[in-house]
C-alpha cells in the first residue's frame, strides 16, 4: 500500500496509473543499477519508493519522444512480422 507519496500527488505528474507503474519500475531498476539519486533524502528505504518520491517531486518524467520511438518500433516490428508470413 502506498502511503507516501500519495497516489493523487503522483498522478499530478503522470497521466495514468499504468504509466506510473511503468515509470516507477524503470526508475527503480536504474537506482538499483547504480544511477545517481535525484533527491538528497528519501523516506523510503526501497528503490520503488525512492522512484515514486522522485516522481512526486517532478524529477522523473516520461519522455514523449521515447514514447513515439517505442510506438514506431512496435509498428515496424508488426510490419516485419507480416512480411515474413
Swiss-Prot record:
One GO CC term on file: DNA-directed RNA polymerase complex
Keyword list, A-Z: DNA-directed RNA polymerase, Nucleotidyltransferase, Transcription, Transferase
Disulfide topology: none
Enzyme type, top EC level: transferase
Biological processes annotated in GO: DNA-templated transcription
Reaction equation(s) it catalyzes: RNA(n) + a ribonucleoside 5'-triphosphate = RNA(n+1) + diphosphate
Protein's UniProt keywords contain Transcription: yes
InterPro entries registered for this protein in UniProt: DNA-dir_RNA_pol_omega, Pol_omega/Rpo6/RPB6, RPB6/omega-like_sf
Gene3D superfamilies: 3.90.940.10
Keyword Iron: no
GO molecular-function terms, A-Z: DNA binding; DNA-directed RNA polymerase activity
Pfam families: RNA_pol_Rpb6
Domain of life: Bacteria
HAMAP family recorded: RNApol_bact_RpoZ
Protein name in UniProt: DNA-directed RNA polymerase subunit omega
Organism: Latilactobacillus sakei subsp. sakei (strain 23K)
Lineage, highest ranks first: Bacteria, Bacillati, Bacillota, Bacilli, Lactobacillales
Gene (UniProt): rpoZ
